[in-house]
Amino acid sequence: EVIEKEPDGNLLVLTSSLEGHIEDKIQEIDRQTGEVVNELIMEDIFGGKYEDRVDWTHLNTVSYQPETDTIVISPRNLESVVKLNWTTKEIQWILCDPRFWEGTEYEKYVLQPEGDFVYQFQQHTAYQMETDLDGDDQTIEVSMFDNHYVKVRKSDVLKYFDGEKESYLLVYAVNEAEKTVKQIKKIPTVWSTITSSAIYDADSNHIFGMCGHVKDSEDKRRGMTYEFDYDTEELINQFSIKSYYYRASEMKIDWNDLAAAMEIKDNYIMGELYQPVKATWFFWQKKPEQVLEDGEITLHLTGQVLYAGAYDHQISQIIFHGKKNT
């Protein structure tokens, strides 16, 4: 994920340390110079207290709160949402089932639940919200898409996972002063085991569930999108597509901007399109003899713009091969 730290400001980027692990690093990049001005590797805050797997944390979202200089991150494989100070890297709180961190030095950061709860598992798009949904100025709200899925390898988590085969749109009210949390909204959706997103639209007071990886649908349609009234939880719209997708985002369309003529520059490098080669986990271990299947990556040219898409792969480089080895 790449977001603006503030409008037209620096960029916050989720990336990989490649120090034996992937999807475990956050960088702040100066928008003008491209220089990395701040960064965090997850091992630095959790001190190696994890099972040493390549993708032990799996960061999937980050947001920044300028008024407190804090970030909210979603390390999916820790079944947790974490808020920390971006300058000092000090943990503010952790939102998860308290049993996950029980008996560790991080137990003190876990928010204490009030009322009924369905805790998240393998969540995506965990963000601090701008809208006050509970009418309490002493709390902040956090929304997320709860995939509600646990991989078999996580034997300890499986002991308290409820086994429900449905996902949820969740909203929590967090009292940061008292270190408590209430679950103020839980809307079930079709079971989407990975990817996916939740979006609240303040203008309409609607909440959207973007289920990007539906495995057990009767009609074999893999992507499902829901639109609910936030207050009544009434289903307003529902759309499905044949293929999986990573996540969906709301689009605010500026029709005047779209109607303006597109500037066409004369410095495009034109060439032919070739099917990419398959790489292993790390980009320096390429095996050119392995070719990705057509369903795993797509290339198409629209005018002078090349679009590249990949399923479950990260594209780190595109190489154009022209005549006479150019």
Q: What spans do the regions from the language model cover?
A:
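Histidine-/acidic-rich catalytic cores in large beta-rich domains
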Residues: 1-320
